[in-house]
Amino acid sequence: MLNVGDYVGQINKDSSGVWKLYKDKINKITTTKKYGRRYFTKTVFYPLDADDVDNNTKDMEESIGKGYIIVREVFRLNDKTEPYAERWIKWANENPDKATGLI
C-alpha cells in the first residue's frame, strides 16, 4: 500500500524506441464504492487502480535477480525497484537486439 508522496514508475519505450523509466509522485488517494482504491498522480499517469499497482510492485520486487522484469505496468519506485529498473533500462538500451519481444 502506497502513501501520498510515494513515487510510481513505468518502464516503456519512447517514440524513438529507447527504453525509459517514466516517474511521477502520488498526490491523492481515493476510495469509492464504484472504483475502489485509486492512486492519482499529477501529470504522467491516469488514475491508477491501487491493487494493480500494489501487485505490480510485489511482482517487480520478486523478479529481482530472477532474469525477468515487468515492463509497461506501473509499480512503486523504492530502494529495490528503482535501481533494478534503471540497471535493466541501461542494459536494454545497450543491447536492443536482446531486449526485443519482452512483455
Label every model-predicted segment.
Residues 43-103:
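Intrinsically disordered, low-complexity, charged/polar segments
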Residues 30-45:
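Short, solvent-exposed secondary-structure boundary/capping segments
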Residues 14-19, 34-38:
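Short, solvent-exposed loop/turn segments that connect beta-strands within catalytic domains
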